[in-house]
Amino acid sequence: DRDAQTLTDERNDQGDGNFRYEFETSNGIYTQKTGTPGSEGQSNYQGSFRFPLEDGTIAEVTYIADEYGFQPSSDLLPVGPPAPPHVQRLLEIAEDQRRQGITFD
């Protein structure tokens, strides 16, 4: 959209790995992100973005990116079927073992 105007363009970088930015345009595009240094040397991000779809609805994604990877959340993202009961039980057992400090080579 050539006629879109920038409504917000804020950037704050503290120079130590901590930062925040926010950007918004008059045509409904918006993004914001906050970053912090991670405990394992990585950068941790938390943010969101949204934009209008052709049908007039708004697409929105929120996310976290940290030592566990990129973790998006949105009604637009596909969701797999639930794990069968026997798999769910195995996952619970594995989590119990992990909490007890049990490891396997």
From Swiss-Prot:
Superkingdom of the organism of origin: Eukaryota
Region feature Disordered, mapped onto this chain: 1-21
Assigned GO CC terms: chitin-based extracellular matrix
Keywords recorded for this protein, A-Z: Cuticle
One function term, GO molecular function aspect: structural constituent of chitin-based larval cuticle
Domain Chitin-binding type R&R: 16-81
Tissue-by-tissue expression: Arthrodial membrane.
Record field: transmembrane: none
Protein name, per record: Cuticle protein AMP3
Lineage: Eukaryota, Metazoa, Ecdysozoa, Arthropoda, Crustacea
